[in-house]
UniProtKB/Swiss-Prot annotation:
Its main location: cytoplasm. GO terms for molecular function: flavin adenine dinucleotide binding. It is found in: Cytoplasm. This is tRNA uridine 5-carboxymethylaminomethyl modification enzyme MnmG. FAD binds at residues 13-18, 125, 182, 373. NAD-binding protein involved in the addition of a carboxymethylaminomethyl (cmnm) group at the wobble position (U34) of certain tRNAs, forming tRNA-cmnm(5)s(2)U34. The lineage of its organism: Bacteria, Bacillati, Bacillota, Bacilli, Lactobacillales.
Amino acid sequence: MNFQENYDVVVIGGGHAGVEASLAAARMGSKTLLMTINLNMVAFMPCNPSIGGSAKGIVVREIDALGGEMGRNIDKTYIQMKMLNTGKGPAVRALRAQADKDEYADSMKNTVSDQENLTLRQGMVEELILDEEKKKVIGIKTSTGTKYGAKAVIITTGTALRGEIIIGELKYSSGPNNSLSSIGLADNLREIGFEIGRFKTGTPPRVLASSIDYDKTEIQPGDEAPNHFSFMSSDENYLKDQIPCWLTYTTENSHTILRGNLHRAPLFSGIVKGVGPRYCPSIEDKITRFADKPRHQLFLEPEGRNTEEVYIGGLSTSMPEDVQFDLVKSIPGLENAQMMRPGYAIEYDVVMPHQLRPTLETKLVSGLFTAGQTNGTSGYEEAAGQGLVAGINAALKVQGKSEFILKRSEAYIGVMIDDLVTKGTLEPYRLLTSRAEYRLILRHDNADRRLTEIGRQVGLVSDEQWEHYQAKMAQFDREMKRLNSEKLKPLPDTQEKLGKLGFGPIKDALTGAEFLKRPEVHYNEVIDFIGQAPEKIDRTVIELIETEITYEGYIKKAMDQVDKMHRLEAKRIPKNMDWDKLDSIATEARQKFKKINPETLGQASRISGVNPADISILMVYLEGK
């Protein structure tokens, strides 16, 4: 077949999954093509103008630790930074940034355009070109008839795949923010034989900043103390003139307006067919499901420094536009607000993720990968994490190297992908800290310690990032060694000093590390007794030291659990396993095994509906092989 051009990797879709996938493949040396419907929407934020949040912020740190771009890009373009859950334990702390929406997209587009081995091109991909046996992808075809050869293809089409926007009774074919909908590719995936689902998400109205009465709202400032998503970012560059968000609430009048128009709500009238997100429901869904609540929180989030648009977080809706006008004016601070864009719902096709391997390669077609909302997830961060993994694995496949799979104990990205390919999802999947059984290990502060060496091994972490990481870890090791050797002795002046600080006396000599294990003690207080280190210890190293020492016992227990799970993961299941030969397992287990085809005993044990007895039978069978 004649191709216009040939590439190692072709990525379809330039959203948050697509840019990470294409950058990863190109940086690993693969000749890569990124095809996007609209060059002006590369890394565009069609919904909330923010990056991070609970669990999601840790994903961004993981992307950065592996050599990805999202963390670096938001650190260049944020307008506010805030650490969440600071009053809770380190396992659930996460960073959130308010983004300058346009700057974020422009900056990422420039990064993509400047990347060696990467070509950015506008076009609508209509068809995957397969080999004669229809088992391997060899290229793509666009709406203009142009064909490009590819050794691997990654689909990252987001909500554009047969996308339809819904506002009241109005329903029309569209991708996010009135971009083109991808119909041909959606049809093609069905023709190939993929099981396709239909999901829904939504976005709230935007209002004019100058029309808001901020005196009726509560200011939500950013943090003065520096924090960053990228491990490479410097505290010296931390933004001082941050832009605040504002908190307001729905009112009883808001709820009356909504209840009086529920018969016109697409969600309840039958116009919306797709399954919506459980953890980000529309406001009409919220007042129905939580009818006892007198009000709901709303956050007024500026979309950038050079725009008047303000996003009303928490007010996602697809109600008719006239209802939205009344709804907005029922909210304190927005009585005279001008609505610039109405909220809308968008329905789109998804490739049901049980059809994927842990590499995000499809089981049906060799060399074809999918990532992001195409796989049934929600959120920019979840998409970017999957895009990175798909891009790495596409490059490795082309290069004939071993595949890259993140374990549940290594990263939230690993938890997410394992959930998707093992359990599947019947609704838009969102990462939560509660989904991770090893969350004390998967923290914000140690993402580089967990993943940078892995990123270096696959060829994605640059020399500069690697040197920075090694210097940090060397300092961490030196200071940990010092804390474990320097001692506090039960001398009179020590006891007096402890009393003045509100600490109880010590009976025996303690190392600095032993003293730091006390829950009320922090690193700086330990230094008061054992003295300063001979070098200036970086703030991020101190944070890591405090957590590792304070929670040492809990971390050890978690690592013991990880070791047990790794033993199960080490037991591989043959690719062409005949599940009918396992006579003694339950019928439900056999059906699930046939559908998902788990690759390890560990993955099999996590499938919903499979009980320990089924796993024991499978283990005995495998040991007898």
